[in-house]
Each structure stands twice: as structure tokens, then as C-alpha cells.
């Protein structure tokens, strides 16, 4: 039986936020104040739809956006980690659950030749329309009150594991590798044998630390990391067990 590795994308696989990184394509590399002020909490995807429309209206085209996106640096040790997973695909299934979008993630994985490492990518669907503007839609609708309207990562994870079980695939454990506030929901639903791996110094680690201080219930182990190389060491330990 395999281990399921679940990755966030922004500030986990790549060392930045793809949605804010793309702003460098805007005139003077910044957004107008009224556009920035139009963001409402929980409605990030709708906000990014307006950002992409603004970029398109300003004449920013697909090739320029792609060049910017594939220039994003990987998080330290992440290239080594993804190569390690590729060499051990008989032991791991690997998915991405991300609040970025399908175009950005595809560009990065294609440019770095890491598409084959991931069995599935769950994110907000995006495409260029007939005017050459990038458009983005919600990944799904859900009833979770803890998550943004467009994506509950826990719902996605539970559905994926359930579908795999129906196909006869049962995972020995889940290892969840992430950094952000929207990774808290799936991590708190992990079971006793699972491992939450928050990036050191980021929102997920701070929230889990606070939960621990408040004695809030959490079943999984927590192992923090700052480099993908540390994750390799831990995965090597797991597959030797």
C-alpha cells in the first residue's frame, strides 16, 4: 500500500504566491488602488478574476504572463524532493490541492518537467478567452464555514480518498505538506496515522502551534519543515518503517 502525499502550491512547492507574483506584469508592477480595495475576504478568486481582466485590458498577453510565472523560484529543497518522489512513485501517490489556478500550475509543472510526479491537481479552473484574457472559476461550491467560498481543501481530500478506496486503493497514511491558513481545515481532519507538515514560520504552523497551546484536539502528528530536503529525510524514514 502507498502513502498519499498532498501538496499545497503557493509558498510550498513554489517560494511565492502565484496570484501576487503575476502583478509584476501590470503597468508599474502594481494594481490600481480601487482594484486592490475591491477584495472582500473569502472571495479571492472573484478578486483575481478582476485582476486578470485588468491585465488583459492593459494589453498583457499570455506569453508575457507565462514568462513571469515560470520565473518563480521553487521553495528550497523542493526540486530535490520532487525528484525523490519521482524515483519512488511505487511508494507514493501525489496530489496538489491549491487555491491558485490550473493555468499557472500547468505552466510551472510543464516548464520544470514535474507533471508526471503528480497524479492529480485540484485547483480553480482557468483558461484564456477569445479576447486573450485569462478567466478563472471556482473549483467547487461547498458548505464549510471555515474555508473560502471557492475551495474547501478538506472536502477535496475526503472525496479523493473515498474515490480511491472505491477503486481498491487504500493509503497507509496521508502526509499533508502546506503553509497557509486554508490548509488548516484539511489538516485538522487528518487521522492518528497521518502527518501534517507545515512550513516553518508560515500561517499553518502558527495556527497549529496555537491549537496545541489551547489543547484543541488534533489526531495527526505534526512535523515542521523549512526545506524540501528535510521532507525527504522524513519520507525516507516512513518508507523504511
From Swiss-Prot:
Alphabetized UniProt keyword annotations: Hydrolase, Magnesium, Metal-binding, Pyridoxal phosphate
Active site: 8 (nucleophile), 10 (proton donor)
Cited Pfam families: Put_Phosphatase (PF06888)
Cofactor: Mg(2+)
Keyword rRNA-binding: no
Enzyme class at the top of the EC tree: hydrolase
Entry coiled-coil feature ranges: none
Reactions this protein catalyses: pyridoxal 5'-phosphate + H2O = pyridoxal + phosphate
Listed EC numbers: 3.1.3.74
GO terms, molecular function: metal ion binding; phosphatase activity; pyridoxal phosphatase activity
Annotated residues for binding of Mg(2+): 8, 10, 179
Binding site for substrate: 19, 99
Keyword Phosphoprotein in record: no
InterPro entries, alphabetized: HAD-like_sf, HAD_hydro_PyrdxlP_Pase-like, HAD_sf, Pase_PHOSPHO-typ
NCBIfam families for this protein: DKMTPPase-SF (TIGR01489), HAD-SF-IB (TIGR01488)
Family assignment from sequence similarity: Belongs to the HAD-like hydrolase superfamily. PHOSPHO family.
Function: Phosphatase that has high activity toward pyridoxal 5'-phosphate (PLP). Also active at much lower level toward pyrophosphate, phosphoethanolamine (PEA), phosphocholine (PCho), phospho-l-tyrosine, fructose-6-phosphate, p-nitrophenyl phosphate, and h-glycerophosphate.
Name recorded for this polypeptide: Pyridoxal phosphate phosphatase PHOSPHO2
UniProt lineage: Eukaryota, Metazoa, Chordata, Craniata, Vertebrata
Gene this chain is encoded by: PHOSPHO2
Amino acid at each position: 500500500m502507498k502513502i498519499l502525499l498532498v501538496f499545497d502550491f503557493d509558498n510550498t512547492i513554489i517560494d511565492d504566491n502565484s496570484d501576487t507574483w503575476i502583478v509584476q506584469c501590470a503597468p508599474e508592477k502594481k494594481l490600481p488602488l480601487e482594484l486592490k480595495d475591491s477584495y472582500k475576504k473569502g472571495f479571492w478568486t472573484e478578486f483575481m478574476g478582476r485582476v486578470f481582466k485588468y491585465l488583459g485590458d492593459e494589453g498583457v498577453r499570455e506569453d508575457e504572463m507565462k514568462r513571469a510565472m515560470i520565473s518563480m523560484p521553487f521553495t528550497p529543497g523542493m526540486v530535490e524532493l520532487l525528484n525523490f518522489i519521482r524515483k519512488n512513485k511505487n511508494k507514493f501517490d501525489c496530489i496538489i490541492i491549491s487555491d491558485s489556478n490550473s493555468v499557472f500550475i500547468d505552466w510551472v509543472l510543464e516548464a520544470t518537467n514535474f507533471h508526471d510526479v503528480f497524479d492529480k491537481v485540484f485547483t480553480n479552473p482557468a483558461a484564456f478567452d477569445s479576447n486573450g484574457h485569462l478567466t478563472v472559476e471556482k473549483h467547487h461550491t461547498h458548505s464549510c464555514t471555515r474555508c473560502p467560498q471557492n475551495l474547501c481543501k478538506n472536502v477535496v481530500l475526503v472525496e479523493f480518498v473515498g474515490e480511491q478506496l472505491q477503486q481498491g486503493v487504500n493509503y497507509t497514511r496521508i502526509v499533508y505538506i502546506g503553509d497557509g491558513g486554508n490548509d488548516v481545515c484539511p489538516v485538522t481532519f487528518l487521522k492518528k496515522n497521518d502527518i501534517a507538515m507545515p512550513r516553518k514560520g508560515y500561517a499553518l504552523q502558527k495556527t497549529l502551534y496555537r491549537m496545541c497551546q489551547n489543547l484543541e484536539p488534533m489526531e495527526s502528528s505534526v512535523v515542521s519543515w523549512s526545506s524540501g530536503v528535510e521532507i525527504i529525510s522524513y519520507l525516507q524514514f516512513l518508507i523504511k518503517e
